[in-house]
Amino acid sequence: EADAAGTSVALSSDGQMLAIGVPDADGNGENSGLVRLYEWDAGTWSQLGGDINGEAFGDAAGTSVALSSDGQTVAIGAPQHADSGRDSGQLRVYQWNGSSWVQMGASIDGYEGGDALGTSVALSSDGQTIAIGAPGNDGNGLSSGHVRVYQWNGNSWLQIGEDINGKVKADLSGTSVSLSSNGEIVAIGAPGNDGNGSDSGHVTIYQWGGHSWLQLGG
């Protein structure tokens, strides 16, 4: 089967937990996608819990995946999810409760068709902060892209600060994203930026200043 297993992958800090994205799997409809989690146990990789399937046909869940340090929290990007329009995208977070993977809070959806939210995702070490890339978003021009950062308050995911928009149209900002361990510094890849020639690309780094995201360096 053309499942495309390994399109994304993440490890816990100790390397004993593994998450594998399988975006073309058909468990909940054609190309709904899924993520499987494995634990290293007695010399073999054993699946922990059931497959976490995409919500619907064509979601491509597992295009991106991130794990908390202890491997007990997993974030799953489904950039082709269509709740807010075709390819608006979606991000879901699950936590291991000892017997199964249970969703934490509501799904986070892209704003509109083409946003492709969930193309990239990153988690802080404790799994309480997530950064989500939506490179097709048009907030600062067509396909300028953006990243949104959310924090878990015990009941739901609350956005921290404003959307971090790409600099200009076609930046595709949010194609890749990374978070520091404490979730207070985020690095954002924008491969379509033309600052040093067509599609030369760039990376911007932001730090949470208590009220807003402040760029570090140029």
Range-by-range predicted roles:
Residues 1-218:
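Conserved beta-strand/short-helix segments
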